[in-house]
C-alpha cells in the first residue's frame, strides 16, 4: 500500500486515533467494472487497478436511498429531517442519502471520495464511506470530512484515523488495514441544517475513486502519445509569493501548493471567484484569489489546505464538475490534455530525482500538468517556483512518471465545466 504523502519539505502530519463504531449489515447489489480478480492476484497487486464511480445528476442520485431527503432540481435536499444532532453547541436537523453498493471488480485498498454541494449559511454535510470483504465483514462508517462552503460559524474538518480491524482514514483517504481487501463499497452523505430552519444544503454529485496498486518500484515509462506538442494556456501562479501570509491558513508559501494549483486550473476555465468574494484580503495583496482558495479549501482537522477532496469541492463552487481520481500512466494524462483539460497532479520525489524542479525534494506536492513537448516531455506549471515567471517547467517523462505514479499512485484533480466532455473511458473506468 502506498504511504500517503502529506506535506512537502516538511514532516508528515500525525493524526489522532479514535475508536470506530460497529457497522450495520447490508449486501452489495450494484456491480461495475471488470470481473472480480482472483484472491491470488489481489494479494500480489501486480496490476494497477483504479476505478471511479459517481452519481452526478438527479436521475443518478435517485438510485440512492433517501432518508428525510428528496431529489429536486438535480440535487438532494432535506425534506423532513429524520433526527436532530448536536454539534459544537448547535442543534441541527438532518437527512441522509446513501449510495447503492458498488463492486469495482477487484479488492480495493484505498479510496478517495469527492462531492459537489452547496451549503447556505447554517448548513453543512458529512461524507462517510464503508466497505465489505468477500467474507461479508463490514467496516465501520468512517468520516472523510464535515464540509461546508462557508467558515464563519462552522469549520470544515476531517476527523482523524478512526481505526478498526479493516480500515483507517489518512486525511482524505480511506485505507485498508494490513492485508484486508474490500470488494464492495458504499457512500453515505448526511445533510444538516439548523434545527427549525427550512434552508437546506444541496448535494449535486458525489462519487469515489477506489484503487489497488502494486507495492513500491519505479513507474513504467510510457511512449509519447497523441498529445505530443500540445501545451494548454494555463495561467501561472506562484505559491511562494504568499510565504508567511495568513498564519491562520498555515502561513502560505510551501503549504499552499494545492490551492495555488486549483486556482490555476480555475483561471484556465475563467471560473475564478468574483472579487467581491475576497474583499477580506488586504488591499494590494498579490493574487488574492489564491488566498481565497486556501481559506475555503482549508481543513481545520488536518490544519492545512492540501486536502484533495476539499480542493475539488472548492472548485465545484464555480460551475465546474470536479473530482479526485488516479491515472495509471502518463499516456492517460495525455488523453486529458488532448481533450483540453489540464490536471492537478500530486507528486513526491527525493533530491536529484526530478531535474529542473524548483525544489530539491518533497514528500508531497501538487502542480498542474498542462501539456507535452514534441518529444513527450511533461510541461507543467509548478507553483513552487519563487515567482510566476519561473512556474512553467519541463520535466523528463520518466522522472515525472516516477514522482507522480510512483509517488501518489497517479492522483489527479480533474476540474472542468460540465459542458466539456471527458476523454473516452477505459475498460476499467477511472473517470
Regions found by a protein language model. Give the residues of each.
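Active-site-adjacent structural segments surrounding the nucleophilic cysteine of cysteine proteases
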Residues: 190-304, 430-431
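Conserved active-site-adjacent core of cysteine acyl-enzyme catalytic domains
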Residues: 90-92, 99, 280-431
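A short beta-strand element within beta-rich, extracytoplasmic domains
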Residues: 106-119, 349
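Noncatalytic regulatory segments and standalone regulatory/sensor domains
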Residues: 8, 49-90, 101-106, 122, ...
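Secretory targeting and sorting signals
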Residues: 1-37
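Trp- and S/T/G-rich repeat-edge/linker motifs of beta-rich repeat architectures
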Residues: 42, 48, 137-161
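Intrinsically disordered, low-structural-confidence terminal and linker regions
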Residues: 15, 33-60
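Short, surface-exposed tryptophan/glycine-enriched loops
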Residues: 158-182, 335
Amino acid at each position: 500500500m502506498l504511504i500517503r504523502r502529506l506535506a512537502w519539505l516538511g514532516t508528515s502530519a500525525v493524526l489522532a486515533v479514535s475508536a470506530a463504531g460497529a457497522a450495520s449489515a447490508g449486501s452489495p447489489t450494484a456491480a461495475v467494472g471488470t470481473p472480480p480478480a482472483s484472491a491470488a492476484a489481489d494479494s500480489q497487486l501486480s496490476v494497477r487497478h483504479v476505478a471511479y464511480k459517481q452519481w452526478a445528476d438527479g436521475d443518478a442520485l435517485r438510485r440512492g436511498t433517501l432518508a428525510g431527503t428528496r431529489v429536486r432540481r438535480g440535487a438532494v435536499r432535506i425534506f423532513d429531517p429524520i433526527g436532530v444532532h448536536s454539534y459544537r453547541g448547535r442543534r441541527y436537523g438532518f437527512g441522509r442519502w446513501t449510495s447503492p453498493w458498488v463492486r469495482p471488480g477487484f479488492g480495493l485498498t484505498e479510496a478517495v471520495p469527492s462531492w459537489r454541494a452547496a451549503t447556505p449559511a447554517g448548513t453543512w454535510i458529512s461524507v462517510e464511506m464503508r466497505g465489505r470483504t468477500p467474507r461479508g465483514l463490514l467496516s465501520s462508517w468512517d468520516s472523510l470530512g464535515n464540509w461546508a462552503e462557508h467558515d464563519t460559524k462552522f469549520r470544515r474538518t476531517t476527523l482523524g484515523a478512526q481505526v478498526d480491524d479493516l480500515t483507517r482514514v489518512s486525511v482524505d483517504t480511506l485505507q485498508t488495514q494490513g492485508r484486508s481487501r474490500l470488494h464492495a463499497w458504499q457512500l453515505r452523505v448526511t445533510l444538516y441544517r439548523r434545527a427549525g430552519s427550512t434552508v437546506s444544503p444541496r448535494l449535486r454529485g458525489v462519487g469515489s475513486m477506489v484503487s489497488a496498486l502494486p507495492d513500491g518500484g519505479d513507474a513504467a515509462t510510457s511512449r509519447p502519445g497523441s498529445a505530443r506538442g500540445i501545451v494548454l494556456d494555463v495561467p501561472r501562479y506562484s505559491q511562494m509569493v504568499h510565504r508567511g501570509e495568513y498564519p491562520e491558513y498555515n502561513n502560505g508559501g510551501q503549504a499552499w501548493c494545492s490551492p495555488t494549483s486549483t486556482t490555476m486550473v480555475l483561471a484556465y476555465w475563467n471560473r475564478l471567484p468574483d472579487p467581491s468574494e475576497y474583499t477580506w484580503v488586504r488591499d494590494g495583496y498579490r493574487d488574492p484569489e489564491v488566498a481565497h482558495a486556501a481559506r475555503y479549501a482549508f481543513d481545520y482537522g488536518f490544519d492545512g489546505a492540501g486536502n484533495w477532496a476539499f480542493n475539488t469541492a472548492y472548485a465545484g463552487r464555480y460551475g465546474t464538475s470536479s473530482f479526485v481520481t488516479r491515472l495509471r500512466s502518463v499516456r492517460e494524462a495525455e488523453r486529458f490534455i488532448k481533450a483540453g483539460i489540464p490536471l492537478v497532479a500530486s507528486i513526491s520525489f527525493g533530491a536529484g530525482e526530478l531535474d529542473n524542479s524548483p525544489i530539491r525534494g518533497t514528500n508531497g506536492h501538487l502542480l498542474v500538468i498542462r501539456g507535452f513537448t514534441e518529444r513527450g516531455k511533461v510541461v507543467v506549471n509548478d507553483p513552487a517556483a519563487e515567482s510566476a515567471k519561473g512556474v512553467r517547467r519541463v520535466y523528463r517523462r520518466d522522472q515525472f512518471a516516477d514522482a507522480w505514479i510512483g509517488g501518489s499512485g497517479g492522483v489527479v484533480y480533474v476540474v472542468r465545466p460540465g459542458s466539456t466532455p471527458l476523454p473516452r473511458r477505459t475498460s476499467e473506468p477511472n473517470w
